[in-house]
A protein has these predicted regions:
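Nudix hydrolase/Nudix homology domain
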Residues: 56, 125-163
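Short, well-ordered beta-strand micro-motif
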Residues: 39, 109-113, 131-134
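Acidic, metal-coordinating catalytic segment for phosphate/diphosphate chemistry
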Residues: 2-36
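A short coil-to-beta-strand element that immediately follows conserved catalytic motifs
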Residues: 85-94
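Active-site-adjacent beta-strand/loop module that shapes the phosphate/pyrophosphate-binding cleft
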Residues: 96-119, 146, 153, 157
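Conserved Nudix-box catalytic region and its N-terminal flanking loop in Nudix hydrolases
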Residues: 41-81
Length: 163
């Protein structure tokens, strides 16, 4: 079950900040890099988040900061967005161009099977809802890309180059 929050003003503010950040990154960086964690438990469930600033259900994740490794960013983002601690080595599923953000954004998707849930993720200004969902009963608004990555991982098919 996922916890919910709904604050229209906060959602608008975060959307504006997200857009401003992408404009800034476009001019200040040659490329942006993000990570996503495909957190799969032994019960056949995946952890998904619904952000306050963009529609649909996604894997938890975010940007790699200057001076940070991708695995450090993944560890930080999973702790922040999912309250999940990685206890074993994540496996890189693929590196993708994410055209939804810009022509400069790349995403590293990691499969995380060894983890510990620190606490139930509560809604905040960034995450409206979060939780584990059975793979055969994903939320209706789970994004196309999220469903595609799950299909690739579960079937063993190689990932495409574009998110």
């Amino acid at each position: 079950m996922a916890a919910k929050v709904n604050d229209g003003r906060e959602t608008l503010r975060l959307r504006v900040l997200k857009r401003a950040a992408h404009v800034y990154w476009r001019f200040s960086r040659g490329m942006t890099l993000g990570v996503r964690g495909v957190v799969l438990d032994d019960g056949g469930r995946v952890f998904l988040v619904r952000h306050t600033y963009t529609p649909g259900w996604h894997f938890p994740g975010g940007g790699v900061e200057v001076g940070e490794t991708a695995l450090t960013a993944l560890t930080r983002e999973l702790a922040e967005e999912a309250r999940v601690e990685i206890t074993g080595g994540p496996v890189l599923h693929g590196i993708f161009l994410n055209r939804a953000a810009s022509q400069r954004d790349h995403v590293l998707a990691y499969v995380v099977r060894d983890f510990r849930v620190l606490e139930v993720k509560r809604p905040d200004g960034e995450i409206a809802e979060a939780g584990f969902f059975p793979l055969d009963r994903l939320p209706e608004t789970t994004t196309r890309a999220t469903r595609a990555r799950l299909d690739e991982i579960l079937s063993g098919r190689p990932p495409p180059p574009v998110w």
